[in-house]
Amino acid sequence: MFCSLIAVASNIYQKNDNLYAGQATTNEVRNAIKDQNHVFVYYYQINCLHCKRVSPYLIPMGEKMNGKFLILNIEGDQKSWESYKINQTPTLVVYKNGRETNRIEGEQTKNKYKNFFNSES
């Protein structure tokens, strides 16, 4: 029984780990904000409980934004926290023409993220 629980937990961890497979570097995020006229950036931390809860539905929604969605792990990256004015994770920010136009901070419902993407697309 115990081995079965470990196997299930390991499988869930691997599925969540795969969500972050396409994450961006800080340089890629900086360049995308500067060069693209419209981009969403999801700031998260690997050890953030709230990020672990929302990532399974937030990331697939963001990936439907046709290349206008980037994922950045800011755990331990104080410069990114300050540069992008991140107060907490998860944080989803939309940039248009190099400037932040809106953000949603903290753990939110699937519907709230969906509405955010729809209103900012």
Feature-to-residue mapping (PLM):
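N-terminal targeting signals for export/organelle localization
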Residues: 1-19
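A short beta-strand-turn-helix
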Residues: 20-37
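Short active-site neighborhood of thiol/selenol oxidoreductases, capturing the structured segment around
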Residues: 34-46
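Thiol-based oxidoreductase modules, predominantly thioredoxin-like and allied folds used
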Residues: 43, 62, 66-79, 88
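The canonical Cys-X-X-Cys-His
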Residues: 48-51, 92
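Typically the conserved alpha-helix immediately C-terminal to a functionally engaged Cys/Sec
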Residues: 50-65
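Structural micro-motif
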Residues: 84-93
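Non-catalytic, surface beta->alpha helical segment in thiol-disulfide oxidoreductase systems
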Residues: 93-121
